[in-house]
Amino acid sequence: MAAPYPGSGGGSEVKCVGGRGASVPWDFLPGLMVKAPSGPCLQAQRKEKSRNAARSRRGKENLEFFELAKLLPLPGAISSQLDKASIVRLSVTYLRLRRFAALGAPPWGLRAAGPPAGLAPGRRGPAALVSEVFEQHLGGHILQSLDGFVFALNQEGKFLYISETVSIYLGLSQVEMTGSSVFDYIHPGDHSEVLEQLGLRTPTPGPPTPPSVSSSSSSSSSLADTPEIEASLTKVPPSSLVQERSFFVRMKSTLTKRGLHVKASGYKVIHVTGRLRAHALGLVALGHTLPPAPLAELPLHGHMIVFRLSLGLTILACESRVSDHMDLGPSELVGRSCYQFVHGQDATRIRQSHVDLLDKGQVMTGYYRWLQRAGGFVWLQSVATVAGSGKSPGEHHVLWVSHVLSQAEGGQTPLDAFQLPASVACEEASSPGPEPTEPEPPTEGKQAAPAENEAPQTQGKRIKVEPGPRETKGSEDSGDEDPSSHPATPRPEFTSVIRAGVLKQDPVRPWGLAPPGDPPPTLLHAGFLPPVVRGLCTPGTIRYGPAELGLVYPHLQRLGPGPALPEAFYPPLGLPYPGPAGTRLPRKGD
């Protein structure tokens, strides 16, 4: 029995009568038969009608989205599986890419004019057909030949395009990355660097903060906070239409092994090289993945040499076949710093690679010159990786894999004191006495004696100071010490020499030519001098301490990078004396 109608006083019944399958509610009151008001049946009809309208609208939208997806430059198997949000994102990105590419040099665009009208494909020559097919597949062939993936970023740091080869090197999807922000895929500690490389943020002045090497990959990834990307990014005024870019970033990867990288787990170090087009405010670059860290997975060829270095780039061990490519043996390399063999013009780039190595855990250096013992140099390129020790998890070292790119060049050009002929060293061995002698008391016309708190005189003889052409008159009254009175054991290895006439003769205490048993970390070799000054290096020279030259690098002996002196004391032109003529900066021990 049906429930009583609420307004019937509880004594009536509600029945549904009608024919032909229709159900009409009626209210039987005493002596009356009244039609009941609209009930659940009419509401159900309205809901059904609304659902049908929404279903029809969604069907039309899906049809339009399907047609839009077919216009995307993607394979049909991929475009048919996209959702609506992905279709809209890829469509907007493609339109932005077309606008970005139209500003290229030369501008890129679809072929406006096809074959001549009325000329059927069958009537075209074989050469025209081959050329057309080649142009259609040219992009794919180029991507397959590149050892990396290509991508383009707009002014906001979003991927306008990224090649499908990114799945080979990072294991990520091209469809998911296109239109997304690059900051969603790079390490939080590299956000500031990417902003600077894109020209969206002015590089902050001051020295870089020395990173700390942590054995825990999870804790190291949380050291750097994600920088805020302001809505109104300050764009640097373009100094040129095209600017070259080369930097290293850590990008997410699903192909990295657990515990492989000590700096960040789940990230790969990518070497990004490309061009920043300032007028279009975008970056077109190529990303290279660096070789794996384990030597078991690294194919070693005949032109490759493996070094094991400390975090300060001191050589701990090297392969014996290093003598096949250089005139230096393992005994002459072990215990020395790599900076003692690097050409002076390449020292700045090696230092930057050193900073990136300590910060990101892996780096590839540019082309640099490695000094030889007999003079000259060889060209090298190295891939360095911070690896942990199997015995001591907290200890780390550097695997330095160098590719020998050339034979020895400039064999008759000495660039450092250890490259000088052996006759100079024999001249130093006139007396076998190993004990150093104290200099004479200060007299008029001679150099002053060192103070009590000054560093002790190094073992070796005093080299005669060659006065400059304009100072011959003033130096006539000054006497020179007898070389035989200061005997020393000859060891002119890894010392820095410059002609004394280049610098003004002020009371500066010269260092001995022969260094102590272990060279101090602040020694400066002649490779750091500019070619003009380095070309003046001859046997009759004098060597000064690094503070007199204004070029020191004690930060290279620490675990992390850091400036030793302000930028004014590291002049880009390689000037050996930063202060005014006739003056020098005070140094501890003088």
UniProtKB/Swiss-Prot annotation:
Q: How does it assemble?
A: Efficient DNA binding requires dimerization with another bHLH protein. Interacts with ARNT; forms a heterodimer that binds core DNA sequence 5'-[AG]CGTG-3' within the hypoxia response element (HRE) leading to a transcriptional repressor on its target gene TH.
The segment(s) forming the PAC domain are 365-408
Known function:
May control regulatory pathways relevant to schizophrenia and to psychotic illness. May play a role in late central nervous system development by modulating EPO expression in response to cellular oxygen level. Forms a heterodimer that binds core DNA sequence 5'-TACGTG-3' within the hypoxia response element (HRE) leading to transcriptional repression on its target gene TH.
User: Where does the PAS domain start and stop, copy by copy?
Assistant: 135-207, 293-359
Specify where the region named Disordered lies, as residue ranges: 198-229, 425-494
Q: Which organism is it from?
A: Homo sapiens
Database matches in Pfam families:
bHLH_HIF1A, PAS, PAS_3
Protein name stated in the entry: Neuronal PAS domain-containing protein 1
Record's PROSITE patterns? BHLH (PS50888), PAS (PS50112)
Composition bias of kind Pro residues appears in: 433-442
Gene Ontology cellular component terms for the protein in this record: chromatin; nucleus
**Compositionally biased residues, Low complexity:** 212-222
InterPro entries the UniProt entry points to: bHLH_dom, HLH_DNA-bd_sf, PAS, PAS-like_dom_sf, PAS_fold, PAS_fold_3
Start and end residues of each bHLH domain = 45-98
